[in-house]
Curated annotation (Swiss-Prot):
Composition bias, Basic and acidic residues: 106-124, 138-151, 161-178, 234-271, 400-421, 454-464, 563-576, 643-661
Keyword flag Glycosyltransferase: no
Family membership noted in the UniProt record: Belongs to the AIM21 family.
Locations listed in the record: Cytoplasm, Cytoskeleton, Actin patch
Alphabetically ordered keywords of this record: Cytoplasm, Cytoskeleton
Organism: Debaryomyces hansenii (strain ATCC 36239 / CBS 767 / BCRC 21394 / JCM 1990 / NBRC 0083 / IGC 2968)
An annotated GO cellular component: actin cortical patch
Stated name of the protein: Altered inheritance of mitochondria protein 21
Region (Disordered): 1-421, 454-486, 512-661
Keyword presence, Cytoplasm: yes
Organism phylogeny: Eukaryota, Fungi, Dikarya, Ascomycota, Saccharomycotina
Biased composition (Polar residues): 39-50, 85-95, 192-213, 319-334, 381-399, 590-607
Free-text function comment from the UniProt entry: Involved in mitochondrial migration along actin filaments.
């Protein structure tokens, strides 16, 4: 087991050789550099003192930072390290170191498990000088990290050294320390929670040595390396004892895991150890040298040591908080489930109670039917009944349902072929189904219902009208209308037009009008005949008298055309109207005119016959002209009607006949 423990420390020894060679070159530098070197030496001293307390598995994370420093772009700052005093001068790592560091990064957890398992077996498995040199190498790499500034999270020792360097350089850059806390939590989850207790106990032992180191740093005095090395060895022995006791308490499962991890790390370390064999041999020789006192000069380990228990306490508190939160969540879930269960119970209980109430209300008997005094009562009765709502009017339903009940009561003795369920179903369909369509010649089945409803509704309406009370329209009290408004006003409208009533025409329906006309015509004819006879007698008497004989000149002068015309107009015995009816004729006028005409005619004829022979030729010509004058006038001036000419012709014919007789 001792060989297996020494193998993981092999890659870290070559830097021990660099540290031994560098102090010879660092004698002629300033005091400022020596002070910083002293501080770093004190930090190394604190690392050596707390190695056992912080467990060896913390160591492998230092090489990670050396790798980052070697690969970082800040490599030009490396040559300044040899200026430091005897404490620790660091050069850039050789190319042979880089693969070692990479392997260490991959296997830092396996080394951690191997170191723990080695402490289980024996306290003498780890030699104090080897462990001191191992920590010294870690300190040198931490110095490189301070210059470069690129840091990766590591275990507890790396955390403390990082925090110390950050406090020296920048007080504000604390992000790397926070990252280390997260890595610690992850490591504990992987390795188990059993390692929390021993780490806390180890950290409690650290501050005593760290405080003394801090005082030495403040006074800038260097303590003897031998005394510090002895103290560190004593502390290691105590820590190994504690680790052995704690390892016995661990579960067997953890031991199996640690054994497996050791086997893996051994294989990887063998591959790594093939290249740096020379450096390991030189480092083993340097361990025996007296330059080891540089290790105990890390006093600022105390600050990190004090911070570690704080971090551990924070982790414990976090775990407690998580447990408390889980408990609270479980309690809240339980409470929610209980509340939901209680709500469901209450809802079920509420739903059950109305069902029970409904069940209790169903068996109650319906109220006694009352006489239907109005439609409202019939409407209420329809709702009280449990049957389905039919389509017909409420009154017909209300009348039909009691009839069904009476029929059922009468037919109780007769066993029904249908079951009770079917009977109920049929009763419920009575109002829903129609009576069908009436065939031709049949009476409409709904006609009787309409008649019944009208008969029932008519007395109700009459009663309502008789019971109605008219509201009295009351005007505003305490006010009276003026008299001008109380008395009625008669408005008379005068029409625009004056209307006159008169009979414009009449119709007389007489059947004897034609007979009267015929009689009138006969009378006229008789009168004319009598007149003609009388005229003839007068003419005969006048022929015998000479008084009526006149000269042709006197006749011609006395009878102008106008007089002749008037005479003929007056001598006309008849006057014919537009209706071809004879008017009354004055007999006296006709007789006188006729007599005058006859006399004038006779006188003219006699004068012509008598005087024509005795007169001279000059006179004859004059007489002829005078005699012809009246004829011309008669022809030219007299324009007689056809009737008048006819009468004259008749007269002349009569006269001629008489003369012949």
């Amino acid at each position: 087991m001792s060989d297996s423990i020494s193998r993981p420390s092999i890659p870290r020894r070559p830097k021990k050789q660099l540290q031994v060679d560098l102090p010879n070159h660092s004698e002629g530098f300033d005091r400022s550099d020596t002070e910083s070197d002293n501080e770093q030496m004190v930090s190394l001293e604190s690392l050596e003192s707390n190695e056992a307390s912080d467990k060896i598995p913390v160591i492998p994370k230092r090489p990670d930072r050396s790798k980052s420093s070697s690969k970082s772009p800040s490599l030009p700052a490396i040559p300044k390290r040899p200026q430091k005093s005897d404490t620790s001068g660091v050069e850039s790592p050789s190319p042979s170191d880089l693969p070692e560091v990479e392997n260490e990064e991959e296997n830092h957890k396996s080394i951690y498990d191997e170191s723990v398992s080695s402490k289980k077996h024996s306290d003498d498995a780890i030699e104090p000088p080897e462990s001191s040199e191992f920590n010294y190498e870690v300190g040198d790499r931490s110095d490189v990290d301070v210059s470069d500034g690129d840091k990766t999270p590591g275990n507890t020792n790396t955390k403390t050294s990082i925090k110390e360097d950050l406090n020296i350089t920048d007080d504000n850059s604390m992000h790397s320390f926070d990252d280390d806390l997260e890595t610690v939590l992850q490591d504990r989850d992987d390795n188990g929670s059993s390692s929390i207790g021993p780490e806390i106990s180890q950290d409690n032992n650290v501050p005593s040595s760290s405080e003394s180191d801090i005082n030495a740093e403040l006074g800038e005095e260097y303590t003897d390396p031998d005394s510090n090395s002895q103290k560190s060895c004593g502390n290691r022995d105590k820590e190994n004892d504690e680790l052995s006791t704690e390892s016995d308490k661990r579960n067997p499962n953890e031991r199996d895991q640690s054994n497996k991890s050791e086997e893996k790390t051994i294989k990887k370390d063998q591959e790594v150890s093939n290249t740096p064999k020379v450096t390991d041999a030189e480092a083993s020789e340097d361990r025996d040298s007296d330059n080891i006192p540089h290790i105990p000069r890390r006093p600022k380990k105390s600050k990190s040591a004090t911070s570690e228990p704080d971090a551990k306490s924070i982790e414990v508190e976090n775990l407690d908080n998580t447990n408390i939160i889980d408990q609270k969540q479980t309690q809240t879930n339980k409470d929610n489930n209980e509340e939901a269960y209680s709500i469901n119970e209450t809802s079920e209980s509420k739903s059950e109670t109305p069902q029970q109430e409904k069940n209790t209300t169903k068996p109650k008997a319906p109220p006694k039917p009352k006489k239907l005094s109005s439609k409202i009562a019939a409407f209420q009765q329809m709702f009280n009944q449990e049957t389905a709502p039919p389509r017909n009017s409420g009154t017909s339903k209300s009348t039909s349902k009691p009839d069904l009940e009476t029929k059922n009561s009468e037919n109780k003795e007769v066993p029904s072929r249908l079951s009770t369920d079917k009977m109920k179903f049929a009763q419920s369909l009575q109002g829903m189904m129609g009576k069908g369509i009436a065939m031709p010649g049949m009476v409409n089945p709904n006609f009787h219902q309409k008649i019944d409803t009208e008969e029932i509704e008519s007395p109700d309406k009459e009663v309502k009208i008789s019971n109605m009370k008219r509201g009295i329209a009351k005007g505003p009290r305490g006010k009276k209308l003026p008299k001008s408004l109380k008395n009625p006003v008669n408005v008379e409208v005068t029409p625009r037009f004056n209307s006159f009533v008169s009979t414009i025409w009449e119709l007389n329906f007489q059947a004897d009008t034609k007979s009267n006309d015929m009689e009138g015509s006969e009378n006229v004819s008789n009168n004319t005949e009598a007149q003609k006879s009388e005229n003839n007698e007068e003419i005969l008497n006048l022929e015998n008298k000479s008084e009526y004989i006149m000269d042709s000149e006197s006749v011609s002068n006395s009878t102008p055309a106008s007089d002749i015309k008037e005479i003929r107009e007056e001598s006309s015995p008849l006057k014919i109207d537009d209706d071809d009816v004879y008017s009354e004729i004055d007999k006296s006028k006709t007789t006188q005119s006729e007599s005058r005409n006859l006399e004038s005619i006779d006188s003219t004829e006699g004068s012509r016959n008598i005087d024509a022979e005795n007169l001279p030729e000059e006179i004859k010509s004059d007489n002829d002209s005078a005699a012809s004058y009246p004829k011309k006038s008669e022809d030219s001036d007299l324009d007689l009607d056809d009737n008048e000419q006819h009468i004259l012709e008749n007269q002349e014919s009569d006269l001629n006949l008489r003369k012949e007789d």
